[in-house]
Swiss-Prot record:
GO terms for biological process: division septum assembly. Mg(2+) binds at residues 37, 59. Residues 22-195 form the EngB-type G domain. The lineage of its organism: Bacteria, Bacillati, Bacillota, Clostridia, Eubacteriales. It comes from the Bacteria. CDD domains: YihA_EngB. InterPro entries: G_ENGB_dom (IPR030393), GTP-bd (IPR006073), GTP-bd_ribosome_bio_YsxC (IPR019987), P-loop_NTPase (IPR027417). SUPFAM superfamilies: P-loop containing nucleoside triphosphate hydrolases. The gene is engB. One of its GO terms (cellular component) is cytosol. The keyword Flavoprotein does not apply. GTP binds at residues 30-37, 57-61, 75-78, 142-145, 174-176. NCBIfam families: GTPase_YsxC. Keywords: Cell cycle, Cell division, GTP-binding, Magnesium, Metal-binding, Nucleotide-binding, Septation. It comes from Clostridium acetobutylicum (strain ATCC 824 / DSM 792 / JCM 1419 / IAM 19013 / LMG 5710 / NBRC 13948 / NRRL B-527 / VKM B-1787 / 2291 / W). This is Probable GTP-binding protein EngB.
Length: 200
């Protein structure tokens, strides 16, 4: 799988604004500042496809990006940032869950967690939502360049135990800084997605 083209399509505030062309979708979700924008930029090899915000919790819309004119990457709002009102937190929750409900085009959800830390309560809730709505899930532990190789086994065990990880799902470490394992990650993220010869 080769990503030759990545194009921003729309920032959607409402479900009626979501694309209706029926193309497959892969969604990316994680708490604020987990490195979601950096990861999407890294795997598409576009430095500025997704704007990396210095302000946690700034992304509040559902952003759609067309990949190779075949399918979408969907960037969901970051969750879990403390310095917002309860009303705003509820709005983000509604936005994320509103996207997940009955989205037939959605083929898998990529949940990003910080490789350095135990998953938060919000991470656990998000993972449970993904499983409740019966989507295929890939958990990516970001910022892996920040931990020692010897810590990876311990941290992977902690993350999986905290999430009550389902063995049918997949787990990867990734660093947007080094991009090590990028090609393998792309192939696994995009497996099972409908795409044309343009993506081969």
């Amino acid at each position: 799988m080769i990503i030759k083209q990545a194009e921003f399509i729309i920032s959607a505030a409402w479900k009626k604004q979501f694309p209706i062309d029926g193309k497959d979708e892969i969604a990316f979700v994680g708490r604020s500042n987990v490195g979601k924008s950096s990861l999407i930029n890294a795997i598409t090899n576009r430095r500025k496809l997704v704007k990396v915000s210095g302000t946690p919790g700034k992304t509040r819309l559902v952003n759609f990006f067309m990949i190779n004119n075949d399918f979408y990457f969907v960037d969901l709002p970051g969750y879990g940032y403390a310095k917002v009102s309860k009303k705003e937190l509820e709005k983000w929750s509604q936005t994320i869950e509103g996207y997940l409900v009955g989205r037939e085009q959605l083929k898998k959800v990529i949940l990003l967690v910080d490789s350095r830390h135990k998953p938060t309560k919000d991470d656990i809730t998000m993972y449970n939502w993904i499983k409740y709505y019966d989507y295929k899930c890939i958990v990516i532990a970001t910022k892996s360049d920040k931990i020692k190789r010897s810590e990876k086994v311990k941290n992977e065990k902690l993350i999986k135990e905290t999430l009550k990880f389902n063995d049918s799902d997949e787990f990867y470490f990734f660093s947007s800084a080094t991009k090590q394992g990028r090609d393998e990650l792309i192939n696994n993220i995009c497996s099972g997605i409908n795409y044309s010869e343009n993506s081969l």
